[in-house]
A protein has these predicted regions:
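Short, acidic/polar
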Residues: 27-40, 83-99, 118-120, 145-148
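CE4/NodB-like, metal-dependent polysaccharide N-deacetylase domain
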Residues: 88-108, 127-131, 153
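Beta/alpha (TIM)-barrel catalytic core signal, keyed to glycine-rich beta->alpha loops juxtaposed to Asp/Glu
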Residues: 111-165
Length: 165
């Protein structure tokens, strides 16, 4: 089966996400552009990065050079822990590095409950989605208690809870 033929999953907000994505965690920033370009060449259409990875610029260069129409791509990036009270500025920085006007999925990378800012960050992500800067919003590495707090405080459920296996 060609990677392009793999199905999409419909999220709770109605948007779709490719079932298979290419992640760039721990990828050398100097190699990111080349490796993402190859992933796109073989058919990947979902690229998963994060501000903390330090390689969003390489992802952006590969996307720009690929010639693939933006609407055919799905780009995920993540808000790092120290920016949870400043999600809008953090996303703007990521968008600049990626060379994009929006991301398809913006995630809170970790709940960091000791700081108590993940609900504030979530409220900001809701606004960013309304502004069109993130088509879908979600979380990463959240436990049930954190998810319950988001729903209790905002009535908006994350479209994704990305976890490591």
């Amino acid at each position: 089966m060609c990677i392009r033929d793999r199905p999409n999953i419909t999220l709770n907000d109605g948007n779709t996400i490719p079932q298979l994505g290419f992640g760039v965690f721990q990828m050398d920033p100097d190699k990111t552009e080349e490796l993402v370009a190859e992933a796109l060449r073989v058919g990947y259409r979902h690229i998963d990065t994060a501000a903390i990875y330090g390689n969003e610029e390489g992802v952006g260069r590969a996307i720009a050079k690929s010639g693939i129409p933006r609407e055919e791509l799905f780009v995920t990036t993540k808000l790092w822990n120290d920016r949870q009270t400043d999600a809008a500025a953090a996303l703007d920085e990521s968008l600049d590095k990626l060379g994009l006007e929006y991301v398809d999925l913006y995630l809170i990378h970790w709940p960091t409950p000791a700081k108590g800012n993940y609900v504030v960050a979530w409220q900001q992500l809701i606004e960013l989605q309304k502004q069109g800067k993130a088509k879908s919003i979600g979380v990463s590495n959240f436990e049930l208690e954190h998810l319950d707090q988001l729903e209790l405080k905002t009535d908006v459920k994350p479209a994704v809870n990305q976890v490591e296996l």
